[in-house]
Amino acid sequence: EILIGLVGSEMCIRDRFKDNTGGKNADYIPYLANIDKNLFGISICLLDGRTITLGDSSYCFGIESVSKVHTAILALRQYGAEKVLKMIGADATGLPFNSIMAILLENDHPSTPLVNAGAITACSMVQPLGKSDKKWEAIVSNITDLCGSAPQLIDELYKSETATNFNNRSIAWLLKNYNRIYDDPDMSLDLYTRQCSLGITAEQLSIAAATIANDGVNPVTKKLIFDASLSPKITSLVATVGFYERTGDWLYTSGIPAKTGVGGGVMGIMPGHFGISAFAPPLDSSGNSVKAQLAIKYIMNKLGLSIFGSTRFTITG
């Protein structure tokens, strides 16, 4: 039996890593380059709805690629697992998250909704087709359901992203060339850019992760958000490519499927136990938060947990 109070020790976790100077803010998006590099927050949401929050867990940061998990869930809710597999796919590319080469090498499908090409395709699939405002409402409503509270669009980040997303424009139209996008490419790209520009907190992301870990039931609102049969599909997508080309190393050392974003957030799913999120802007060379990785790995190792193991424990306190 491991007491949750041990996991929640700020001295033991946050203070252990807060002075780490590794990594640097994403500098190709001006808004992200200017975020305070010393921000650092951690949140754990248990399946009974209790949350443990440390440091800057209520700071609103850009969700960026962590939003791909949420839109993948929306696609699964609207189309079902079989159609999503056929229309997008579930394979890791082994290449960077924004790779155009991955599309050229496997032009029969975008590979997975958790890389840029697949995420833009997922946005194109959002119903109702052809109606940008309604599609956006569906995207925001889905994220609100998962997090238990609404995200807020960061206008400055959206403008910054829109002004610099040349690579994603190429991806959208290349998908169109291969008939792997299902609505207007420019509309789909704008929806994707907007969803990446949503402001979110570590606490909100931990609740979303706990909803996945809890078979689709939000542990805070107690509402059923999606069918329990989808939870293993979502977790498998995250386990396969959540850290892009570094996913294998991450799973090997942490034992928890997690999705990362260049805004500095990491969201981890421990099925049947909890959701966890950590946030710190400085990134490693693969675009993953240095301190968030350290904190989550530390917690998982302290608990002796792995999604691939048979360890059982009880959370008390």
Regions found by a protein language model. Give the residues of each.
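Single conserved hydrophobic/aromatic residue that forms the stacking wall/gate
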Residues: 1-8
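A short, well-structured edge-of-sheet supersecondary motif
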Residues: 18-54, 267-268
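Short Gly/Pro-enriched turn/cap motifs at secondary-structure boundaries
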Residues: 32-35, 111-112, 163, 255-259, ...
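Active-site SXXK
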Residues: 48-49, 62-85, 208, 276
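Penicillin-binding protein/beta-lactamase superfamily catalytic region
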Residues: 162-165, 173-233, 284-289
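Structured C-terminal helix/loop/strand segments within mature extracytoplasmic catalytic/sensor domains
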Residues: 214-317
